[in-house]
Amino acid sequence: MTCVGIDIEQFVRDPYGSGIQRVLQQLALQWPVDGPGADFVVPLDDAFGLLTPEQAAGLLSLAFVPRDPGADLRHIVRDHLVALDPTRVRAGDLLSIYDAWLLPEVSYLPSVLERFELFAKCMPTAMIGYDVLPMSDPANYRFKPGTAAWVSEYFRHLATADAVVCISDYARDGILGRLRRDPALPISVAHPGGDHIEVQEGRPPARPLFTRLGTMEARKRPLEILAAFLEARRTQGLEADLLFIGAPSASDEEINEPARRASASDPAVRWVQGASDDEVRELVGRSSAFLSIGTEGYGIPVLEAVRLGTPVLFDGIQPAGDLMSGHGARRIDGLGHHGLVSAFEAYGEA
């Protein structure tokens, strides 16, 4: 029987509950019992641990469950991995175990990319394609010194892997266009779903609440959202609240500081970090509107908000928003400052 090795070292090294890591979690949870065999492969001490899909699902889900404030998720993941006591093999044995190799997460780790290069010489390789934004919009990304060459190496593999499955048409078009992937090589689109959340009725509060979910990244326009909200309150008398849910930018403190300052000084602005799945669902489900503005490779939170019964207001490159337009999501004039101010005013009175 065919057996696939799935490399999840990136998750173990940097677990942070992103949309990409949600895809990994669902990949493990939904791996077909009648499909090819699969091991989720992780470095473990001086060997590699081989996790079953069930074991991997439990490990990957740790990024989305409640934990004590200040707890180091990397340590939690490491302790859980050791407790699983998975089958261990030497690095040299991996090549003889697998018939194909899958890299399911964006990774600029030299160890991950060098391993992919080695396996590509011996067997079919596949990747999940999320976007090419670091190549098409480099101004939005600040990589640590010495990382640039590995960023390029990751995208080189995305252009040459034997097969790529993309999360959206936008991702596929970027890989074919920007990366110039040979269109004769297999490349397909499989949209992530939102059915990990049960359909619910929305529970909006009496005072309008606008919620934005995701890491503070320039491409998602958190500062533009904040500036428009504050102006709508100041000039239009908007009586509403704004909630940010998500981690701070790891590379751009200039994005974090204004949001941190506003949440500390203005009771109408809140910023919740480190929220679990249950906490996110409660907060989004009790919002008046969910904001998704800017550029997304796909936008799983849009699907989650729709299933929680919370109307979605979106603008920009939003594949999931476009899919759900007219079905719980609405495109607004949200890329310009004045349009976003007007949207806050209009929907704050609804």
What do the predicted segments below correspond to?
Residues 1-350:
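Carbohydrate transferase catalytic cores enriched for Leloir-type hexosyltransferases
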